[in-house]
């Protein structure tokens, strides 16, 4: 009796795990495009609308396969252990990201899928093994998004106290050194550091293909950027420098300021003798016309905003609630994030602007990823191809 062959959608096709393939995510596209924040309920949009993102496993699986088939390069999850409350219990239901990545990697063909790992709450030897498991499931398509800090409230759940800012990177360096030794050292090893003292460590198998997963970091401080330059293949940096017209919903990136951010990161890496990729995220609301897009934006993020969840985020950032114009400006900036709102033509132009500023890739947050990604793939991606940004 012969067993049936696996479905094509779950077969791994024509991709190696060479270092070059890992760094390029197996793609020759000048501008890489991926999905950001789909592993939790509501994604990155604090909205009450009924069509908001469920974050369910079935929807994540469908989205991963849809993104893979469309040629998107990456899936990047948020590391979240508790949410922000509000009427929607915003971001309270979330999948742990390494196991999430492993399962999705086994069901996709080409896309790189990251796990977001908080170094203070993951034992590095255990983390090294679980990440290798995910990497084998995807034949070399796992990536590590490394985070050395987070909210005090989340760490308290694990009985862990947040270290002083710069000290987090000392701890993070030891953590990553141990992980890399687990990934590369053929022999047993000891480790005697400030935060970790380990004896006779051994970890097999090694990552798929004898190379190491792509490592991403989002440090913004001087010490954080130095850490990233030493250790990581790419930076993920948020963009705030832009003007936003409240009436038209049109965002105008401050290209000079954005380019300065990218150039600074690349210069820091070059001074250390390294090259790095630079990525960012945007919140996309794309419709056939600008009018439809701005109307949907107002419906989702103004008329139906989960303001209690937004307030919780602001307060955690040190901005207490106040019924003032200044506070409302903070609210609006927080909920819309860095928005790409408009027609397919306009959104494609915004992607091109970010590429010209030096970004290698962009992660998209979307109100409902499954409902809206097909239009982006059919109407925005072909425009980027004509611009020479994608094949």
Placement of each model-derived feature along the sequence:
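Active-site-adjacent structural elements that line small-molecule/cofactor binding pockets in enzymes
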Residues: 2-391
């Amino acid at each position: 009796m012969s067993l049936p062959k696996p479905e094509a959608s779950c077969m791994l096709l024509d991709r190696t795990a060479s270092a070059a393939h890992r760094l390029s995510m197996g793609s020759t596209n000048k501008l890489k495009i991926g999905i950001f924040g789909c592993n939790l309920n509501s994604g990155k949009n604090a909205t009450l609308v009924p069509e908001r993102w469920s974050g369910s496993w079935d929807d994540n699986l469908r989205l991963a396969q849809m993104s893979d088939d469309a040629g998107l390069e990456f899936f990047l999850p948020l590391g979240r252990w508790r949410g922000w409350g509000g009427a929607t219990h915003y971001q309270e239901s979330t999948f742990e990201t390494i196991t999430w990545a492993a399962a999705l990697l086994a069901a996709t063909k080409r896309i790189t899928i990251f796990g977001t790992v908080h170094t203070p709450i993951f034992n590095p030897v255990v983390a090294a093994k679980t990440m290798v498991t995910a990497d084998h499931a995807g034949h070399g398509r796992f990536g590590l998004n490394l985070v050395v800090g987070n909210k005090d409230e989340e760490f308290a759940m694990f009985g862990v106290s947040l270290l002083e800012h710069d000290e987090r990177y000392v701890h993070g360096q030891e953590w990553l050194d141990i992980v890399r030794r687990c990934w590369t050292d053929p022999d047993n090893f000891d480790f005697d550091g400030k935060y970790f003292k380990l004896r006779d460590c051994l970890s097999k198998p090694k990552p798929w293909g004898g190379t190491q997963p792509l490592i991403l970091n989002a440090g913004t401080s001087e010490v954080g950027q130095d850490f990233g330059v030493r250790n990581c293949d790419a930076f993920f940096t948020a963009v705030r420098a832009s003007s936003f017209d409240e009436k038209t919903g049109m965002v105008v990136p401050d290209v000079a300021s954005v380019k300065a951010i990218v150039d600074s990161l690349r210069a820091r890496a070059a001074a250390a003798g390294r090259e790095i990729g630079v990525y960012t995220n945007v919140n996309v609301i794309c419709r056939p016309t600008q009018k439809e897009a701005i109307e949907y934006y107002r419906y989702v993020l103004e008329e139906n905003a989960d303001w209690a969840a937004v307030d919780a985020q602001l307060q955690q950032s040190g901005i207490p609630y106040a019924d003032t114009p200044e506070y409302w400006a903070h609210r609006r900036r927080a909920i819309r994030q860095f928005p790409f709102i408009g027609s397919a033509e306009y959104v494609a132009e915004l992607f091109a602007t970010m590429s010209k500023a030096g970004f290698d890739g962009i992660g998209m947050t979307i109100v409902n990823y499954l409902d809206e990604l097909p239009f982006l793939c059919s109407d925005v991606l072909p425009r980027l191809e004509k611009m020479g940004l994608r094949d």
